[in-house]
A protein has these predicted regions:
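Extracytoplasmic
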Residues: 38-40, 59-61, 69, 77, ...
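An acidic-aromatic
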Residues: 61-114, 184
Length: 221
């Protein structure tokens, strides 16, 4: 009996370690599945960019809209905007590059990296080494954090820490760091799943007097 009790105790002692070892994969799998089920989404966010090389910091807020299969709009309070209208991706950044807008095809790597959630949740276990990074309450919601390290060189980031909501498996916060020393901290302050979004919300009209730089051809007009 004592031996049996001892073995049971050992089993229960080992169990939490096994659960912890599997939890990061389970969390990212749930998040990826929840993201794949979304037909549309709307999120408000607050972003802080820190450049460790220059010691500068910039904070801004904005709204991101997404509708399947290929519509995306990110509006910043600074007036900057990123928009994907179904075929073309537009980068209008008057705060840092006034007087111009960059356009490029919305496909391939362009499509996968511009959507913040997609860059983490598109085949995550194939692309990243995933590990647990603790728990936290964010805005009154329980979350689990995971760390993502690219298995292959990644121009978007060298490592990321992502907080996943325990209730709906949405992303509530993320930190990422790039090879050039840029740190990005994003907090999701509001999230709505499957809102009714009109296609006009994703349309981009070139402001008067702004030059268009076509990245594919290198032509400016």
């Amino acid at each position: 009996m004592k031996k049996l009790t001892y073995l049971v105790a050992i089993a229960f002692t080992a169990l939490p370690f096994a659960v912890r070892a599997q939890s990061a994969d389970a969390i990212i799998d749930r998040a990826a599945a929840a993201y794949a089920r979304l037909n549309s989404m709307r999120a408000e966010f607050r972003q802080t960019l820190t450049n460790t090389l220059t010691g500068t910091m910039q904070t801004t807020s904005g709204v991101i809209l997404r509708r399947k299969p290929n519509l995306l709009s990110i509006n910043f309070e600074s007036g900057d905007r990123v928009a994907a209208d179904g075929s073309t991706l537009w980068f209008y950044l008057p705060s840092s590059a006034p007087g111009q807008v960059i356009r490029m095809p919305y496909s391939g790597e362009n499509a996968s990296t511009v959507d913040p959630a997609n860059q983490f949740l598109n085949s995550p276990r194939t692309r990243f080494t995933v590990s647990s990074a603790g728990t936290a309450a964010l805005g009154g919601r329980a979350t689990h954090a995971i760390t993502l390290v690219p298995k292959h060189p990644n121009s978007a980031f060298t490592s990321a820490k992502v907080w996943i909501d325990d209730a709906d498996s949405s992303i509530r916060q993320f930190d990422l760091e790039t090879a050039n020393g840029l740190k990005r901290h994003v907090v999701i302050t509001s999230f709505t799943a499957n809102p009714d979004l009109n296609k006009s919300s994703f349309r981009f009209s070139v402001p008067k007097g702004v030059k268009v730089v076509d990245q594919a051809s290198g032509v400016t007009f």
